[in-house]
Regions:
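Short, locally clustered residues in the helix-turn-helix/winged-helix DNA-binding domain
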Residues: 127, 227, 267
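Catalytic cores of RNA-modifying enzymes
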Residues: 1-213, 252, 261
C-alpha cells in the first residue's frame, strides 16, 4: 500500500471521473476520514461493511485493521482501483455491490458516506435487515440528517425517524464542510452513529408496515388513516380507545410509545 499522502493525492485526482448521477463526491479530508473510521470502534471479532467505498478515503483507514472488511460500490472502475490498492491485505474485500440489494446480515459494524439520493433507502435496509449490527457510522448531507432525526410534531417526523428510534440510539458526531469533498457538493455534510439495540427485526418490520400505513395521508387524523390501513373503521376505533390515542390526533402527533401500544394490540 502507498503512503497516506500519496494515497489521498490519488483520491483527489478522481474528481474528473466523478459521476454526479450516482452522487459521487470523494472525501479528500484525511482527518475527517480517519475520525469517521475511529468512530466505528472496530474491535477483535468484528465483521465490517463499508457502503459506497468510492475512491477509498474511508477504506484506507479501515485497512489499518486486521478484521474482515467488505467494501462495496456500484462503480466497477473504483472497485478495480481498490482491489489494486489493497491486494496485499487479505482481509480487505472490495467488490461490486448495490447497497439496495446487498445482504446486510452478518456484519457487526457498518460504515459509509451515503449517496444523497438513496440515503433513506439504504438506512431502511440496514434497520430492517442488519440483524447482527451493533454500531453504524454514516455521513449524509446535513439536511438529510435533520429529516432522519425529526421529532414528534415536526413536518419530517414519520416512518423512518420512528423506525430509527425503535432500532437504535442516534448520535450526531461531526460536521463536515463541503470543502472536504472533491468535487464539492452544494451542501455541508454530517456524521452520525447508530448504536443498535436488541429490538427484534421482525417486530421492526411489522411496526414499519403500520407506520407507512398510518402516515399515508399525513393531514388526515389517525382514525381516518388507521381505518384505511385496517379497512375497518370500527376496529380502528376500538384499538385507538384501548391504546388511549385520541381519534383526532394526526400521525405526527403520536409518539413511538403510543405506536408500540397500538402495535401490541394489533398483534394480540
Amino acid at each position: 500500500m502507498i503512503n497516506q499522502e500519496e494515497y489521498f493525492e490519488n483520491v483527489a485526482s478522481y474528481k474528473l471521473l466523478a459521476k454526479h448521477e450516482v452522487g459521487q463526491n470523494f472525501l479528500i479530508d484525511q482527518d475527517v476520514a480517519k475520525k469517521i473510521v475511529s468512530f466505528l470502534e472496530i474491535k477483535e471479532g468484528d465483521h465490517v461493511l463499508e457502503i459506497g467505498s468510492g475512491a477509498g478515503s474511508l477504506s484506507f483507514f479501515l485497512a489499518q485493521y486486521d478484521e474482515p472488511i467488505d467494501l462495496i460500490d456500484i462503480d466497477e472502475a473504483l472497485v478495480t482501483k481498490l482491489q489494486h490498492d489493497f491486494e496485499e491485505k487479505s482481509n480487505i474485500h472490495p467488490q461490486m455491490g448495490n447497497a439496495m440489494r446487498f445482504p446486510m446480515g452478518g456484519y457487526s459494524k457498518i460504515v459509509g458516506n451515503l449517496p444523497y439520493y438513496i440515503t433513506s433507502g439504504i438506512l431502511e435496509r440496514i434497520l430492517l435487515n442488519a440483524k447482527e449490527a451493533t454500531r453504524g457510522v454514516f455521513m449524509v448531507q446535513k439536511e438529510a440528517f435533520l429529516r432522519l432525526n425529526a421529532k414528534m410534531g415536526n413536518k419530517d417526523y414519520g416512518p423512518l425517524p420512528l423506525l430509527i428510534q425503535y432500532r437504535a440510539k442516534m448520535t450526531r458526531l461531526l460536521n463536515v464542510p463541503r470543502s472536504s469533498f472533491s468535487p464539492a457538493p452544494h451542501i455541508d455534510s454530517l456524521v452520525f452513529s447508530l448504536d443498535f439495540n436488541d429490538n427484534d427485526i421482525e417486530a421492526a418490520s411489522t411496526l414499519y408496515s403500520l407506520l407507512n400505513g398510518v402516515f399515508l395521508h399525513r393531514r388526515k387524523t389517525i382514525l381516518n388513516n388507521l381505518s384505511g390501513y385496517l379497512k375497518d373503521a370500527d376496529e380502528a376505533k376500538e384499538l385507538l380507545n384501548k391504546s388511549s390515542i385520541p381519534f383526532t390526533k394526526r400521525p405526527e402527533e403520536i409518539s413511538l410509545e403510543e405506536y408500540l401500544r397500538l402495535l401490541k394490540l394489533l398483534k394480540d
